[in-house]
Amino acid sequence: MGGGVEERKVVDLEDGDGEEGEDAAAVAAGSSRETRMLPRMPVRVLLAEGDDSTRHIICALLRKCGYRVAAASDGVKAWDILKEKSFNIDLVLTEVELPLMSGFLLLSTIMEHDACKNIPVIMMSSNDSVSMVFKCMLKGAADFLVKPIRKNELRNLWQHVWRKQLSSGVLDVQHTQQEDNLTERHEQKTGVTKAEHVTENVVHKNMECSEQESDAQSSCTRSELEADSRQTNNLLEYKQPMGRHFSKPDHKNTEKNGGTKIHASNDGNLIPRREEDASLRRMTCSNDINCEKASRDMELVHIIDNQQKNNTHMEMDVARANSRGNDDKCFSIPAHQLELSLRRSDYSRLESQEKNERRTLNHSTSSPFSLYNCRTASSTINAGDAQACSTSATHIDLENKNGDSKTPSQDKRETNQPPIRVVPFPVPVGGLTFDGQPFWNGAPVASLFYPQSAPPIWNSKTSTWQDATTQAISLQQNGPKDTDTKQVENVEEQTARSHLSANRKHLRIEIPTDEPRHVSPTTGESGSSTVLDSARKTLSGSVCDSSSNHMIAPTESSNVVPENPDGLRHLSQREAALNKFRLKRKDRCFEKKVRYQSRKLLAEQRPRVKGQFVRQDHGVQGS
């Protein structure tokens, strides 16, 4: 835009008065929000219209709305005006159908020219077809107006110029220049200098920064605040009347203090120019940024200190608990301290364990047709599983200690032994109820307790499980049926008694090495033992780790397990029910068919008149 735009008024019509423009400028300077939101210069419009009457009407409407208008009767004249005075044109309003050069050609020419392509072009026509509008928009038009044009449409044309300049970044520079001009005029009228406003803003900002500094207990910005206060004192010295410190120079502008320009006004005060204002703005912005950074740094330091204190407290608690556990045989840590210490120590390990538990939940690899075998599983157990197993053993010790006051002497003997581990595995028992639910199709999961000092169950060097499984199979092949039925009855009676008195829900199975033929499950506090039906079904499934639920694959066995007869029995029952249903359906359909045929014959015998049934005379029927 031109250089003379800075000195124009806010609302400058071609036929307006200067006094009205000055009043509007004073009002605009009073409100900072209006100066930012409303346009600061009159929009100059180039109108290209072939019809004379339409051109005069649109020009009058545009001038009434506050625009400066340059009119052209054809496209060639409009292009000549735009080429010569492209810097004085803000908007082009052209008709699609023009003499000598059409509106489409004028639009394409403007879009191809480097100096004019940033000027928004608005097309107008009485033909409102979609194809024409689409064609204009593709060529680069900013908007399309349909004739007859309304006054409010012309009043809103400045928004296109506003958007274009806002996107190109020219508007910010023009706004700052115009705001400076308006504030200078307002200062000349009111006598309030710009240095006073700047000084008040700097003092206010410094007070805010000092308050934030005292709150954050930081001294990182004191030197900067002292420097700002010195500069503020210098400005206050500049504000004093000129007669006190130095004589009035002959020229208006004098350079002092490193190139800072000082303007002498009529009232005897010194006004620093834009360079000093820009430096003051930069200083205030830097002070604000430094204060914000200082407060953020202090908050971060407090958070880190609190975390370190918490970590040290938790480490001390864990070390104290470890030393206490080494002195005593029973290792005990409060549950909440154990949980917090584990979370504080290593987050990634716990997250991986939780993910593994979620993945392996309800996904068992055990099979009811496989036997227990003793393939070594040391390769499958990693360090994380061992740690989780020790954690579960700690929880079991806590549970045993809490229940010592209520349990008989048998449980008290167990707590004096080395720490125990739990290996839950399924035990198939026909007709055995567990937690009030019968296990007819599946196997109840029992927990095997063994001391930690003893060798692990799944070790390949010991043949405890191999002896147990082989003797259980031989018992199955050679045992009589009478003992089987008696054992089943004993199981049902004693499990009913144990469920009345039991509070814990673990099945403790003790398999001695001397007599591995009988497996005795006992509830946690009842103390009663029963003999499982090992002759009917063999041990099946796979040994699973108690902490991470990782299933260990069973080894291959040379013994072939027969198929389940219960499945065949269920299959035969289903086939019988299906055959019964088919027979019933066949009989029902046959009855319906017979009924339909009989009614059809009766209907054919009845007399009809024009397709309708009529009553039959009894005399005719008797004859």
UniProtKB/Swiss-Prot annotation:
Residues 574-616 form the CCT domain. It is found in: Nucleus. Pfam families: CCT (PF06203), Response_reg (PF00072). Its main location: nucleus. Residues 1-12, 396-415, 508-518 have a biased composition (Basic and acidic residues). Residues 44-162 form the Response regulatory domain. One of its GO terms (biological process) is phosphorelay signal transduction system. Induction: Expressed with a circadian rhythm showing a broad peak in the late day. InterPro entries: ARR-like, CCT_domain, CheY-like_superfamily, Sig_transdc_resp-reg_receiver. Gene3D superfamilies: 3.40.50.2300. Residues 1-23, 208-269, 395-422, 492-565 are annotated as: Disordered. Residues 13-23 have a biased composition (Acidic residues). Keywords: Biological rhythms, Nucleus, Transcription, Transcription regulation, Two-component regulatory system. One of its GO terms (cellular component) is nucleus. Residues 520-561 have a biased composition (Polar residues). Controls photoperiodic flowering response. Seems to be one of the component of the circadian clock. Expression of several members of the ARR-like family is controlled by circadian rhythm. The particular coordinated sequential expression of PRR73, PRR37, PRR95, PRR59 and PPR1 result to circadian waves that may be at the basis of the endogenous circadian clock. Belongs to the ARR-like family. This is Two-component response regulator-like PRR95. It comes from Oryza sativa subsp. japonica (Rice).
